[in-house]
From Swiss-Prot:
The keyword Ribosomal protein applies. Keywords: Ribonucleoprotein, Ribosomal protein. The lineage of its organism: Bacteria, Pseudomonadati, Pseudomonadota, Gammaproteobacteria, Enterobacterales. Gene3D superfamilies: Ribosomal protein L17. It comes from Buchnera aphidicola subsp. Baizongia pistaciae (strain Bp). HAMAP family: Ribosomal_bL17. Part of the 50S ribosomal subunit. Contacts protein L32. The gene is rplQ. InterPro entries: Ribosomal_bL17 (IPR000456), Ribosomal_bL17_CS (IPR047859), Ribosomal_bL17_sf (IPR036373). Belongs to the bacterial ribosomal protein bL17 family. This is Large ribosomal subunit protein bL17.
C-alpha cells in the first residue's frame, strides 16, 4: 500500500526520478519554458517553486541550499540574480502548466511548464522591432 507516500515514481527508481527532476529544473530555469508530460510537469512544479522562494532572499546559506539541490553554478547565479528579484513581490505560484495535446508515439498528454511573467532575454529586447 502506498499510504502517506508523496511524489510520483514514473516506474523508475528513486535515484532516477531525483536525477530526472534535477535536470528538468535546470532546464526550466535556463530556458524558462519546457515541454514535457503533464504528470512530470506537475511533479516539477513541486521542486521548482520552493527553489524560487529560497532565491528571493540572497544569502550565502540560501545559495548553498539551492546549489545542493541543482549543482549548476550558472543556474544558481541566474536564479539569484534574475529570477529571485523578479518574483520578489509574489508569494508562490511562479509556474504555469499549459496543456498542448498528445505525444504522437504513445498518446501521452503533453504540457508546457513555464515561469509566470518570464524574464525577457536581452537579445529578445534588442532585436525585437
Amino acid at each position: 500500500m502506498r499510504h502517506r507516500k508523496i511524489g510520483r515514481r514514473f516506474n523508475k527508481s528513486a535515484t532516477h526520478v531525483k536525477a530526472m527532476l534535477k535536470n528538468m529544473v535546470c532546464s526550466l530555469f535556463r530556458y524558462e519554458m519546457i515541454k514535457t508530460t503533464v504528470s512530470k510537469a506537475k511533479e516539477l512544479r513541486r521542486v521548482a517553486e520552493p527553489l524560487i522562494t529560497c532565491a528571493k532572499i540572497d544569502s550565502v546559506a540560501n545559495r548553498r541550499l539551492v546549489f545542493s539541490r541543482i549543482r549548476d553554478n550558472k543556474i544558481v547565479f541566474k536564479l539569484f540574480r534574475d529570477l529571485g528579484p523578479h518574483f520578489l513581490g509574489q508569494f508562490g505560484g511562479y509556474t504555469r502548466i499549459l496543456r498542448c495535446g498528445f505525444r504522437s508515439g504513445d498518446q501521452a498528454p503533453m504540457a508546457y511548464i513555464q515561469l509566470i511573467n518570464r524574464v525577457k532575454n536581452k537579445k529578445e529586447l534588442v532585436y525585437k522591432k
